[in-house]
């Protein structure tokens, strides 16, 4: 294929391949948080292949491409895959959990729920920092150079944007999510999840939001 050969005019194909492979793996990673230690490895691999190779690809073709029908018909805008990665993965995991049921020990015989807390705050913070670093790579892959009719730096749809907008709004979203979750729970473990909620809540429009708006959206998501 000519696509595999050297082509100095093609600035996007290799980026798309790497980014879409990363995002397919990310869908399985998101699902793993719901089923880890609860299903067999073979079962997880099967679910990961279905989610990353079929379900997510359909969502990406519909809403994460300039010619996708959600984009052309309804103006759907999801610059950093808030919907086509995280929402799709979340609902897929929900479908698995409906059949799997609650974790052992989550509920008592009378129906009351037990709080299953994290076992190590330092490990949780370390994990959050690694995820934040990964988010910058994830988000940076959504900014393309010389792609589409506008040229220069563009989003996944070919619209003009800047890498600065993505980076700064990502920082604002992380801060907003952490603060919003702390305001609601006063729990350091939940604050770590609040950072993720903040980024995911604001991710769809990181190329559009005014920074305080990105913070406000993330605060609401974390809260």
Map each language-model feature to its residues.
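Hydrophobic alpha-helical transmembrane bundles of multi-pass membrane proteins
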Residues: 1-223
């Amino acid at each position: 294929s000519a696509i595999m050969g050297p082509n100095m005019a093609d600035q996007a194909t290799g980026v798309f391949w790497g980014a879409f492979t990363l995002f397919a793996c990310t869908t399985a990673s998101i699902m793993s948080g719901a089923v880890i230690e609860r299903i067999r490895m073979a079962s997880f691999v099967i679910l990961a292949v279905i989610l990353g190779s079929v379900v997510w690809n359909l969502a990406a073709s519909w809403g994460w491409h300039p010619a996708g029908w959600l984009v052309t018909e309804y103006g759907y805008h999801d610059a950093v895959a808030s919907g086509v990665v995280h929402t799709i993965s979340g609902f897929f995991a929900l479908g698995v959990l409906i059949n799997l049921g609650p974790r052992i020990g989550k509920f008592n015989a009378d129906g009351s729920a037990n709080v299953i807390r994290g076992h190590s705050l330092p490990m949780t913070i370390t994990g959050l920092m690694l995820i934040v670093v990964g988010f910058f790579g994830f988000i940076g892959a959504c900014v393309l150079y010389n792609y589409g009719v506008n040229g220069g730096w563009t989003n996944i749809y070919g619209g003009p944007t800047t890498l600065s907008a993505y980076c700064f709004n990502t920082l604002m979203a992380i801060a907003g999510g952490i603060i919003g979750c702390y305001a609601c729970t006063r729990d350091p473990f939940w604050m770590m999840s609040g950072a993720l909620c903040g980024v995911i809540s604001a991710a769809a429009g990181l190329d559009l939001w005014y920074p305080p708006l990105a913070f406000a959206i993330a605060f609401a998501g974390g809260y």
